[in-house]
Amino acid sequence: MKQILFMDTTLRDGEQSPGVNLNEQEKLQIARQLERLGIHVMEAGFAAASEGDFQSVKRIANTIQNATVMSLARAKESDIRRAYEAVKGAVSPRLHVFLATSDIHMKYKLCMSKEDVLDSIHRSVTLGKSLFPTVQFSAEDATRTARDFLAEAVEVAIRAGANVINIPDTVGYTNPEEYYSLFKYLQESVPSYEKAIFSCHCHDDLGMAVANSLAAVEGGALQVEGTINGIGERAGNAALEEVAVALHIRKDFYQAEPSMTLKEIKATSTLVSRLTGMVVPKNKAIVGANAFAHESGIHQDGVLKEVTTYEIIEPELVGESQNLFVLGKHSGRHAFTEKMKELGYEFTTEERDAVFEAFKKLADRKKEITEEDLRALMLGEAAFAAQQYNITQLQVHFVSNSTQCATVVLKDEEGNVFEDAATGSGSIEAIYNAIQRILGLECELADYRIQSITQGQDALAHVHVELKEGTHQVSGFGVAQDVLEASARAYVHAAGKLKSFIQLVK
């Protein structure tokens, strides 16, 4: 039975989702969780895009131990050398070089002839192979490329040293039958086919990204590319968790097994959702809140009698726990540390002490602490520690009618304290006005969302905000049991990002 490898591009293609703006620390958090998920290759970013991207890719490359770290690059020498500088410190570095091969791209975007494109592929892959142990070549817009020319381009890439060949459905145009036949065509038409691993990369514009990916596996693809939760530009990418579970459940049909630690799927999905601010739909396959819920009386009766009557996936397979309480206010530092290690978290003594203190404060107010609470707590404290400014005091009081007054005290990384007060039509507006006054910002609140992390009146709140100034938009989140505190944390998180961006472009 063949093993299917997964290439995750959440940190590159996924971050291109409108409104998603991850900082370096957040990208590193996701990368570490992808490593726990057992992802074979992670595309850490596009090193040549900006200095910020370069530094993020480099830090991930120098941190990850059990996965290949890859940077995207155009078929340009400067891009390829920049990618090398970013990932050369990785345990297993890889270059991902791409060039469009469809007539429409060659004519209108590249302004290149077929001969020019083939020459560029040869030169870029040859250079990449002189620097990297493995090189992946992507024929951008492959599904709208003339098949004979695509086969020619792929052959040139393999002969130049490409180890992996990606056949992307860049605009989500193809369907499963066409995609399957395309892989079969290449298998028959590319002389050096056996010398490379073939990969698929599907977009969801017509809602067929997962189906197309599975068809590619049938057609001979040994690597599947996509993102967690299917996030990405436009309608998104193939959701890797859906492809992986489909292969596992239907291995009888596909004769393939996913090389992924499936029990880490739920935790990975939740982390990506909270850091990006992209809410997972309740009815989403595998990771949606209703994925294992049964409303119909007939279905409920069947499940109670024999679970397989209506449930083809065991919730535990993907790490969907029953969320039973695991710790309480009497739990000690050792029990807390061991539980966090079990969940995959590692920290320095200083980080452990800070998170344990936050845990004890929560345990004093919340009777039962669940695994979901612990993950949220860790996420919130990590963001809190990485911020330029942290909230040290927050006070809100009623003025008149619907007017509220908020006093906010912030401390920066150097220990400087800033205090101001402001009024607003409600507590949230007053808090946000006060923070704006302290930071000297004039921005628009583009989005505000609040979610309950667990059930019950004492549940933690997760607040997501998006701030916009001109054409630049950033997001932030905050986690706390108190809604106002979570809201303030989220705003400070986003405002700090925005202030950094403004200072950078000045």
From Swiss-Prot:
Its EC number is 2.3.3.13. Its cofactor is Mn(2+). GO terms for molecular function: 2-isopropylmalate synthase activity; acetyl-CoA C-acetyltransferase activity; manganese ion binding. Its main location: cytoplasm. One of its GO terms (biological process) is L-leucine biosynthetic process. This is 2-isopropylmalate synthase. It is found in: Cytoplasm. PANTHER family: 2-ISOPROPYLMALATE SYNTHASE 1, CHLOROPLASTIC-RELATED, HOMOCITRATE SYNTHASE-RELATED.
